[in-house]
From Swiss-Prot:
Belongs to the class-II pyridoxal-phosphate-dependent aminotransferase family. BioF subfamily. GO terms for biological process: biotin biosynthetic process. Pathway: Cofactor biosynthesis; biotin biosynthesis. Homodimer. This is 8-amino-7-oxononanoate synthase. Its cofactor is pyridoxal 5'-phosphate. It catalyses: 6-carboxyhexanoyl-[ACP] + L-alanine + H(+) = (8S)-8-amino-7-oxononanoate + holo-[ACP] + CO2. Substrate binds at R21, H133, T352. PROSITE patterns: AA_TRANSFER_CLASS_2. One of its GO terms (molecular function) is 8-amino-7-oxononanoate synthase activity.
């Protein structure tokens, strides 16, 4: 088989199963409205849960820092790219979340890959929830450690896997809020089981940080859990981009030596770090609390209005509200039907989700109004098959 045939066969396989991914060019993709091809849609696909990507205070912080620092960091943080803005943000994050240290990464994918590949050795074992993010599972597969997956949120299965003999160390991997199902992990029980077996716990709280808990401290704080490794990302609740790993002093020093994604990458622009500090200030303020309360009310309104006879609604109380439709083609048709009625929603299909669970992944944000939710429900019930 030639290179070209390999590429063509892979693309053909995606096309015939209605799983070929496509990008859409948009003029505006965050906030209440999405603008594409000159048309405005109610946006139910954005991760900008608190609407902070459009916040004037955060925009101004980025602009002012770009004037001071320029638009790039100029290098790896180990060379010349670790500015006072980066240092300030790390210290603010650590204080906010109650950890000795925080380390910044350019993305959540990079943070998860870096931590797992740096820590795990040949005789170690990773025990991960089956629905963990692709960045976590890919890192686990690429590491020299053994990967075992437990049934989603099944703590008994997790316990059985941890009980089997392991020569090295064990790392339990889960998420705070799951990106495709929108549900939460039983973190307190998972932490108890991990500690009973002397395993460390890594929690990726990409979809919980900023959005839940006191001052937006996230799912772990809400559940009274403090994992050895907490990964938070800034493209959702913070409305910007990037990520951080919260950990102990010694683990931070270790990652600075052995996390290749950190050592060999240009750090985020200082202006981005300063914008993130401004975003954190909003999240922790009374305004941030009001934004979280509004989002929670919108989620409740949506769930109360969905016709369960037409759609399978998962037990999700986060901003992520997936409607399971099963068939790939039906999911695509529903997404297109919603767009025709002015609502932008995304059809999620395998391999992102298991076969037979294609869905509309609807995301609600603080930028929406109650009338937007009512319009979405009206269109959904009219488009049901």
């Amino acid at each position: 088989m030639s290179w070209q045939q390999r590429v063509d066969d892979a693309l053909t396989a995606r096309r015939v199963t209605d799983t070929l991914r496509r990008r859409y060019v948009v003029s505006q993709g965050a906030g209440r409205w999405l603008v594409a091809n000159g048309r405005q849609y109610l946006n139910f696909s954005s991760n900008d849960y608190l609407g902070l990507s459009q916040h004037p205070q955060i925009i101004r912080a980025w602009q002012q820092a770009a004037t001071r620092f320029g638009v790039g960091s100029g290098g790896s943080g180990h060379i010349s790219g670790y500015s006072v803005a980066h240092q300030a943000l790390e210290e603010e994050l650590a204080q906010w979340l109650g950890y000795p240290r925080a380390l910044l990464f350019i993305s959540g994918f990079a943070a998860n890959q870096a931590v797992i590949t740096a820590l795990m050795k040949k005789n170690d074992r990773i025990v991960a929830d089956r629905l963990s993010h692709a960045s976590l599972l890919e890192a686990a597969n690429l590491s020299p450690a053994q990967l075992r997956r437990f049934i989603h949120n099944d703590t008994q299965h997790l316990s059985r896997l941890l009980q089997s003999p392991c020569v090295g160390q064990q790392l339990v991997v889960t998420e705070g809020v799951y990106s495709m199902d929108g549900d939460s992990a039983p973190l307190a029980e998972i932490q108890h089981i991990a500690r009973r077996h002397h395993a460390w716990l890594l929690v990726d709280d990409a979809h919980g940080i900023g959005v839940t808990g006191d001052e937006g401290r996230g799912t772990c704080w809400l559940r009274g859990v403090k994992p050895e490794l907490l990964v938070v990302t800034f493209g959702k609740g913070f409305g910007v981009s990037g990520a951080a790993v919260l950990c102990s002093e010694s683990v931070a020093d270790y990652l600075l030596q052995f996390a290749r994604h950190l050592v060999y990458s240009t750090s985020m622009p200082p202006a981005q770090a300063q914008a993130l500090s401004a975003s954190l200030a909003v999240i922790r303020s009374d305004e941030g609390g009001e934004r979280r309360e509004k989002l929670a009310a919108l989620v409740q309104r949506f769930r109360a209005g969905v016709n369960a006879s037409r759609f399978t609604l998962l037990n999700a109380h986060s901003a992520i509200q997936p409607l399971i439709v099963g068939d790939n083609s039906r999911a695509l048709r529903l997404a297109e039907a919603l767009r025709q009625q002015g609502c932008w929603a995304t059809a999620i299909r395998p391999p992102t989700v298991p076969v037979g669970t294609a869905r509309l992944r609807l995301t609600l944000t603080q930028a929406h109004e109650a009338c937007d939710i009512d319009r979405l429900l009206e269109v959904l019930h009219g488009a049901g098959e």
